[in-house]
Amino acid sequence: MRKIDNLDFYRIIVSMGRTGSAKLTGDKLGLETSNVFRCLRQVEKELGAPLFDREKRPMQLTEKGRTFCSIAEQMLTLQNHLLDVFNEDVDEDEG
C-alpha cells in the first residue's frame, strides 16, 4: 500500500490547508509538528508536486494542493458517511 492511501494523511493535509500551520494542525490532531511535516513531505514526494507554498506565512496551498484538499475532503466526508451507515446498522441490530 502506498503511503498516501492512508486517510489519516489526507486528514492532516486538509487540516493544514485550513489552518496554514503545521503546529495548529498538530495541536488539533494530537500530533507532533515534526510528524505533520513528515506526513506532508511523504505525500508531496509520492505525488511529485508541492502542496504548499512554504515561503508564505501562514503557509498557503498551491494549485495542486487546493485540488488535493478538495478531493481529500470529499473522500473524508464519504468515509464518515460510510461509518455512520454501519454504526446505524449496528445500533438497529443491537436494539
Residue ranges and their predicted role:
Residues 1-19, 37, 66:
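Short alpha-helical elements of helix-turn-helix
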Residues 14-30:
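Short helix-boundary/capping micro-motifs
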Residues 21-22, 40, 54:
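Helix-turn-helix DNA-binding elements, focusing on the entry/boundary residues of the two helices
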Residues 27-28, 45, 66:
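Alpha-helical residues within the helix-turn-helix
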Residues 32-35, 39-42:
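Residues within the DNA-recognition helix of helix-turn-helix
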Residues 44-61:
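A short LG(V/I)-centered, amphipathic sequence patch enriched
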Residues 64-81, 89:
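Short, solvent-exposed amphipathic helices
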Residues 88-95:
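Interdomain hinge and pocket-entrance segments immediately C-terminal to HTH DNA-binding domains
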